[in-house]
Amino acid sequence: MLLTELSQILFAQIATPAVATDNLEFSFWKIMFHGGAFAKIVMVTVLLLGIFSLYLFFERFFFIKRLSSKTDSNFMNNIEDFIKAGKIEAASDYCKTQNSPEGRILEKGISRLGRPVSDIVSAMEAQAQVEVANMEKNLNLLAVVPSIAPMLGLLGTVIGMIIAFFNLSHATGSFSPKTLSEGIYTALGQTAVGLAVAIPANFCYNILLTRIDKFVLKAQNMSGEFLDLINKPL
């Protein structure tokens, strides 16, 4: 019954002469908040998720960037000079003054000089894990946004479609295709907004992961250089 009525409406619309639409202006902002109370709640929630994801991204991005810029460019060369000169305490103090992830990792290794190499490696790996965890703080919250935002948008779309077809099934007298189309494009707008929030959030999340991966690679190379240094004949 419903499909028959929809077909009649569609054929009637095709048979009707086209109406001039030159004065119509597409406004996605109006579409976003065109629906009922539930649609507005979904839209506001998704937009808040978008703002939240941007805050997390910039906070983590500049935090990681600030940490990466603290280490001296000649850090490893200076450490090598201290070690070769036998100034272990000075090397440890130099690492502390850096106040950087690299400095803290090497300081753990220097503080265990004289012990088995496995102890030195374990100490540096443990500190590296602490530094990575510090960089990844709240990153799991950002990872959730690309999953939740489209689902909320899809929920809004499904509810909107249900409402649109419910109104169609209970319509009396002649029914305008405009009424149905408004319900459909309003509902689809929910999914569009969800995707518009999820895609940049996913992109931002992967940018942060890439920067953290670069730090991990840098820390591994630095640890390897340090182990080569302490095992090198003086």
Regions found by a protein language model. Give the residues of each.
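Predominantly long cytosolic amphipathic alpha-helical stalk/bundle segments
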Residues: 62, 67-175, 201-234
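Hydrophobic membrane-targeting segments
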Residues: 2, 7-75
